[in-house]
């Protein structure tokens, strides 16, 4: 019988550490619900001690999720661990994930603690955590660069104190597959009580080997939990990509002889949702979830596919959630057809009032473009959910004028608090003019780090999805806006980013590197 691999998703915590990928409480809940539909075993919802916003988001996820374990990260101290436990009160399936650095470099430079002090703190923190929850994970931060003898002592000690999962991260993405697998194997062999805990791997992608290292940790090392994120989202070069792990285990079951409980048909919906919320576009050639992942342009390849799909495809697009439904909705489509498509996309609308709002937005978009695709519907639902969050800034309308040889002018009407404001400005282009009009009133003083446009579907009728990244006071936020009018989408994206800057609960604790 095949071994079970636990899928631990940290999109909402480690994935959110990507510059600009900060998510609101409601956005985290929406992603968590999709992760639950994906049948993820453990959802790491955040770092409770890092901010009041993260604490509230973890609490909301804990209340919303019913079928997955909900986890909070914590540094290995009583204050952080208590905060994590408090945030998880709404769920009976909770995990506290405590971490402490164990490499010589981190202990000396960052912690300024001796190895013996680190060992005692690790033991003390796990002992304390076990009084607050029964499911405790310990991460040896920068574990792969730790000295083997010392790491064995720490791991043995925390298992004795009650840790049920031991995570050995490659925090800086330094490992290579065979060496990492052997490292985990050696640890499990040398730690006397290694059979009392589940061993976990957490790899970063700095050298492009996060997925390979994680799989080696399982195949060679004997780990049975993989920590990963949707789309490989994460700081620096990212984390292990969940979709690649799941489909590797599934497609090469003959080699790995392991299974996971993931519903693979929910992979693409999860990928699209995370991309839309964070504003991080999935590269077209990204494995499994990229737009070109199942595209064949070579004539020889196309001929082979037409004769037998197995000639050039090792998995089917529909297996990972690419829609095979060719029925396109339009302005004549009714409410039932719209509701049915939502169900097919795995989108749950609990209240009739929310469905009515979404359907109204659908009809408004259908008046602007003749065909509504799945990607359009996902964007509609994202906009509807954002509107429910009680934004401080809210787009109302826009008009602009431009002629060759003249500076474009734009007039933007938006709501700021309880006031409706119209503002005019000029700029180097219609987008610049529109954002200048908003900034002239908002006076945020934020630095614009990124402006990007992505067509949601193909063709000139496609909605534009605009991402604006702003920085202020050490915080970096992304705003996303969609509209068939690129100028309007740009204004919406800018206002979306301003909303995140305006919310003080979203300010993060800039404490230290995490696993």
Curated annotation (Swiss-Prot):
At the top of the EC hierarchy, this enzyme's class is: transferase
> Which family, according to UniProt?
Belongs to the alpha-IPM synthase/homocitrate synthase family. LeuA type 1 subfamily.
Positions of the UniProt region annotated as Regulatory domain: 394-515
EC number(s) for this protein? 2.3.3.13
Q: How does it assemble?
A: Homodimer.
Function as written in the Swiss-Prot or TrEMBL entry = Catalyzes the condensation of the acetyl group of acetyl-CoA with 3-methyl-2-oxobutanoate (2-ketoisovalerate) to form 3-carboxy-3-hydroxy-4-methylpentanoate (2-isopropylmalate).
Q: Where mainly located?
A: cytoplasm
Q: Which molecular-function annotation in GO is an example for this chain?
A: acetyl-CoA C-acetyltransferase activity
Q: Which gene encodes it?
A: leuA
In the record, biological process GO terms are: L-leucine biosynthetic process
Q: Which cofactor does it need?
A: Mn(2+)
Q: Which GO terms describe its cellular component?
A: cytosol
Domain Pyruvate carboxyltransferase span(s) in chain numbering: 5-268
Q: Residues that bind Mn(2+), according to the entry?
A: 14, 202, 204, 239
Task: Give the pathway.
Answer: Amino-acid biosynthesis; L-leucine biosynthesis; L-leucine from 3-methyl-2-oxobutanoate: step 1/4
| Reaction(s) catalysed by this chain's protein | 3-methyl-2-oxobutanoate + acetyl-CoA + H2O = (2S)-2-isopropylmalate + CoA + H(+)
Query: Which compartments does it reside in?
Result: Cytoplasm
The UniProt entry, under Pfam families, shows: HCS_D2, HMGL-like, LeuA_dimer
Q: Which superkingdom heads the taxonomic lineage of this protein's source? A: Bacteria
Tell me the protein's name: 2-isopropylmalate synthase
Keywords from UniProt, A to Z, are: Amino-acid biosynthesis, Branched-chain amino acid biosynthesis, Cytoplasm, Leucine biosynthesis, Manganese, Metal-binding, Transferase
